[in-house]
Amino acid sequence: MDNWVFLFSFLTVALLVNVPAIFGKCIDQNNAEHDVGESWQGDGCSKYTCFVTEDGDYYYATTRCPKYRVPPGCHLESKPGEYPNCCPRAICPEE
């Protein structure tokens, strides 16, 4: 069971969002400018990365913590900090 939890603890969820751009920079939801390739911390436990496609469209990729199906007898614990250190981890009793 511990191997199953370990395997899935490294999977993340990414979402692409088309964003406005000005002077070759992504503009985030707080109107802050970010260079292409730059990553920044998002609200909660997430990370954003700015990139541009070959067509000149600007996007940021949102990377979030995985969702778990916690085995019986286990629970999730989160730690403060930046992504990915703040992601919840499955804690299971030793067998």
Swiss-Prot record:
Contains 4 disulfide bonds. It is found in: Secreted. Its main location: secreted. Keywords: Disulfide bond, Secreted, Signal, Toxin. GO terms for molecular function: toxin activity. Residues 1-24 form the signal peptide. It comes from the Eukaryota. Expressed by the venom gland. Pfam families: SVWC (PF15430). One of its GO terms (cellular component) is extracellular region. Belongs to the scoloptoxin-16 family. This is U-scoloptoxin(16)-Er13a. It comes from Ethmostigmus rubripes.
